[in-house]
Amino acid sequence: MKFLALFFLALVGVAFAHDGGMGGMDMIKSYSILGAMIGLGIAAFGGAIGMGNAAAATITGTARNPGVGGKLLTTMFVAMAMIEAQVIYTLVFAIIAIYSNPFLS
């Protein structure tokens, strides 16, 4: 956990490493990009864990009862689509936060 905190603090320096001349607007833009990156990373990480758990449960269920394998596979694909939709919603929110930020106009 300490490594992740140190890693995110190191990213702040990268976000502010330009020569900008707009003052506060550059800080808002930098924090928007940093927040979008962190949010999308968390969403992708959570989605990957959820997809892994869903696949593991489906494989376990199919191994225990091979007769319901097709039904479990269909249910798993629906669950995967719902998990991936949450990550795509986060991506859309991140793009909106970067490109149409109300604090930058």
From Swiss-Prot:
It is a multi-pass membrane protein. Keywords: ATP synthesis, Cell inner membrane, Cell membrane, CF(0), Hydrogen ion transport, Ion transport, Lipid-binding, Membrane, Transmembrane, Transmembrane helix, Transport. CDD domains: ATP-synt_Fo_c (cd18121). GO terms for molecular function: lipid binding; proton-transporting ATP synthase activity, rotational mechanism. Its main location: membrane. Belongs to the ATPase C chain family. NCBIfam families: PRK08482.1. This is ATP synthase subunit c. It comes from Helicobacter pylori (strain ATCC 700392 / 26695) (Campylobacter pylori).
